[in-house]
UniProtKB/Swiss-Prot annotation:
Chief localization: cytoplasm
Gene transcribed to yield this protein: mnmG
Subunit structure: Homodimer. Heterotetramer of two MnmE and two MnmG subunits.
Sections of the chain in a coiled coil: none
Identification of the protein by name: tRNA uridine 5-carboxymethylaminomethyl modification enzyme MnmG
Subcellular location: Cytoplasm
Listed HAMAP family: MnmG_GidA
Length: 624
């Protein structure tokens, strides 16, 4: 085993796998350090990938030739597009995943990746030289040299599991936590916080009364995550839906004092949008019931994940809860649910490249940055791995901004605003939703991945072919036109204004689809359904996209006003509160400063004027 690498990635979860693979795709000699290779690609909580906002991230990861989308297509056992009846901007692709198939596919991919080695062991301490990363020391005494390190420790940093009145150190059920790295971070000067997440019990699906619950099938045909997947070939399954009852709520209320969340045993904050069932009952006391999705964990695994009843109540209380839920009255509980607390670093310590400001060459990704969710972790991992490889090669880091994609929105939110609770991606967080759709992730990002060298030949060939087909279809739709009289003859409701309208312009009408224009111009029927859908979406959003492009231009102008080297004490007119906020956050640009909580327009105006004066003075000095 070699002792020197360009990049070492710590952790084999979703962030770690994407980081290691991205680094290796750029040609950096990369090591993935994990406790046990058998746990690489493990899905610690729910057996699903994607969803609202999250599905956008998976598509963006795929557009940059990441792994998650392809692995999900391999292991997916039910695919659904959420919000399908709404506009394309807020639709969310999602899939139930066979845990075993997903992990096996991920492990095979990691093993087959050139320039990527796997080391089994526990990271104990960061090794610095001249205040920058120089290597990593393991708990067993081994030491490896490198130019960059990516930390993706998930819930393992000083992790503690809570189950009723009992708690014990763990990073995941039956797995030891990582203790040394937290000490290393504190010694360097990082401020660590604590966050909490939880998971529900696991149930024996053979003991569920499936006749008593609603059945939920997937979409047919299934829509893959990856543009490289031609069709889903894995057998598909149904999920079940049931609900809590007033009897369920009574059991929880009688025992809520035994929950670590309410006994004072847990002090840290959990995810707002994924609360435990006891939290739901306390916070939403007027609700008679809460929905539970019964999600199969695999084709050859009878385990079922009851999505919606995450809890850390004592095991016997969890069993009592199950007896009150329709379809689960006689269900055998395989494993109780639990909560887990873990360390995280304030993400405002990071540059938008995910490199730490304190230690050059040190990158963080995933739950260590205060996020929750596989997709959020994976997207950060890809960006961190990409930039770690560039740093190791002596190149500048790459920034994805809020107009580039949801991954840019997330990273900007984290590095500008920090977190007070686990951060989850939603479509509502993005200002440019019409532009940042799940269906056009490759059009937005693959060209950039090609320029960076992170996209391989197979995706390049597929992308080039798709763009040629898309351009040809759009050109054809714009070149074919008719008069209002001709349109009315074809059954279209058009104004008799004498204006010719192209097929592309007709597609902007809400009631006109590709099938309608293809009936008028039969040559359009030759366009494949996926390309036709892209053109139709572009046509329907055309006017709005033009307006949003102007907004993006204004945003980019603000992002171009760089604040590096500004001493806020020297900026006249700033209030003390604004100075303190700016000094603490250290925003990189005016745009980032604008996103600091409670930053006033007046303060931003003063800053902008100061920057312009400074720029003029520097220009005058150079001219002189």
């Amino acid at each position: 085993m070699r002792k020197t690498f360009d990049v070492i990635v710590v952790g084999g979860g979703h962030a770690g796998c994407e980081a290691a693979a991205a680094s290796a795709r750029l040609g950096a000699e990369t090591a993935l350090l994990t406790h046990r290779f058998a746990t690489v690609g493990a899905m610690s909580c729910n057996p699903a990938i994607g969803g609202l906002g999250k599905g956008h991230l998976v598509r963006e990861i795929d557009a940059l030739d990441g792994l998650m989308g392809r692995m999900a297509d391999t292991g997916g056992i039910q695919f659904r597009v959420l919000n399908r009846r709404k506009g394309p901007a807020v639709r969310g692709p999602r899939a139930q995943i066979d845990r075993a198939l997903y992990a096996a596919a991920m492990q095979a991919e990691i093993r087959a990746t050139p320039h990527l080695s796997v080391i089994e062991g526990e990271a104990d301490a960061l090794v610095l030289k001249d205040d920058r990363i120089a290597g990593l020391k393991l708990a067993d005494g081994r030491e490896f040299s490198c130019r960059a390190v990516v930390i993706t420790t998930g819930t393992f940093l000083r992790g503690i599991i809570h189950l009723g009145e009992t708690s014990w150190p763990a990073g995941r059920i039956n797995e030891a936590p990582a203790m040394g790295l937290s000490k290393s971070f504190e010694q360097i000067g990082f401020t660590l916080g604590r966050l909490k997440t939880g998971t529900p019990a696991r149930l024996d699906g053979t003991t569920i009364d499936w006749a008593a619950v609603e059945r939920q099938p997937g979409d047919d045909p299934a829509e893959p995550f990856s543009t490289l997947t031609e069709e889903i070939t894995t057998p598909q399954v149904e999920c079940g839906i049931t609900r809590t009852t007033t009897a369920t709520h009574a059991v929880i209320r009688e025992n809520v004092h035994r929950s670590p969340l309410y006994s004072g045993q847990i002090q840290s904050i959990g995810p707002r949008y994924c609360p435990s069932i006891e939290d739901k009952i306390v916070r939403f006391g007027d609700r008679d019931s809460h929905q539970i999705f019964l999600e199969p964990e695999g084709l050859k695994d009878t385990t079922v994940y009851p999505n919606g009843i995450s809890t850390s109540l004592p095991e016997e209380v969890q069993k009592a809860i199950l007896t009150t839920i329709p379809g689960l009255e006689r269900t055998r509980m395989i494993r109780p649910g639990y909560a887990i607390e873990y360390d995280h670093v304030d993400p405002r310590e990071l540059e938008p490249t995910l490199e730490t400001r304190r230690v050059p060459g040190l990158f963080l990704a995933g739950q260590i940055n205060g996020t929750t969710g596989y997709e959020e972790a994976a997207a950060q991992g890809l960006v961190a791995g990409l930039n770690a490889a560039r740093t190791a090669g002596g190149k500048e880091g790459v920034i994805f901004d809020r107009a580039d994609g949801y991954l840019g929105v997330m990273i900007d939110d984290l590095t500008s605003r920090g977190v007070t609770e686990p951060y989850r991606m939603f479509t509502s967080r993005a200002e440019y939703r019409l532009t940042l759709r799940a269906d056009n992730a490759d059009q937005r990002l693959t060209w950039r991945g090609l320029a960076l060298g992170v996209v391989g030949f197979a995706r390049q060939a597929q992308f080039d072919a798709k763009m040629r087909a898309l351009d040809a279809a759009k050109e054809a739709a714009k070149s074919l036109s008719l008069t209002p009289t001709e349109g009315i003859r074809h059954g279209l409701a058009l104004n008799r204004d004498g204006q010719r309208r192209s097929a592309f312009e007709l597609l902007a009408y809400p009631e006109i689809g590709w099938a309608d224009v293809a009936r008028i111009w039969p040559q359009l029927a030759e366009v494949t359904p996926d390309i036709a859908e892209h053109v139709e979406i572009d046509a329907k959003y055309d006017v709005y996209l033009a307006r949003q492009a102007a907004d993006v231009s204004a945003f980019r102008r603000d992002e171009a006003l760089v604040l590096s080297g500004v001493d806020y004490a020297d900026v006249p007119g700033l209030s003390n509160e604004a100075r303190q906020k700016l000094q603490k956050a250290q925003p990189r640009t005016i745009g980032q400063a604008a996103r600091i909580e409670a930053m006033t327009p007046a303060a931003l105006g003063i800053l902008t004027a100061y920057l312009r004066r400074r720029s003029r003075h520097r220009s005058d000095a150079k001219a002189g």
